[in-house]
A protein has these predicted regions:
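Conserved aromatic-histidine-acidic binding/catalytic patches
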Residues: 13, 17-20, 65-68
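Amphipathic alpha-helical packing elements
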Residues: 16-20, 24-57
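Compact alpha-helical subdomains of small soluble proteins
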Residues: 40-86
């Protein structure tokens, strides 16, 4: 599966995300973590991202440091986290 959004390469607006189904918003938020090798403890998220050829689970939650996110990811994650009620 290809990434849902290029959240690491461009700034999105709240309006761009609001038209998406809640599941897509939830996955897009977690895709930012997955891009950096976050190992999901949630089985559904883990299985979804394992189906993505680009996903390489390398870092568990205890060792994950969100300072790895670039400025695009930080801004987009803030919007997605506010919208994610899944």
């Amino acid at each position: 599966l290809e990434p849902l959004f290029e959240t690491d390469k461009k700034y999105y607006t709240k309006e761009e995300f609001e038209s998406e189904p809640m599941l897509v918003i939830h996955l897009a938020k977690n895709e930012i973590y997955a891009r950096h090798g976050y190992i999901f403890t949630n089985e559904d998220l883990y299985n979804y991202f394992m189906g993505c050829i680009w996903y390489s689970p390398t870092c568990d939650a205890a060792d994950f440091d969100d300072s790895i996110f670039n400025e695009y990811e930080k801004a987009n994650l803030e919007i997605l986290a506010d919208l994610d009620t899944y």
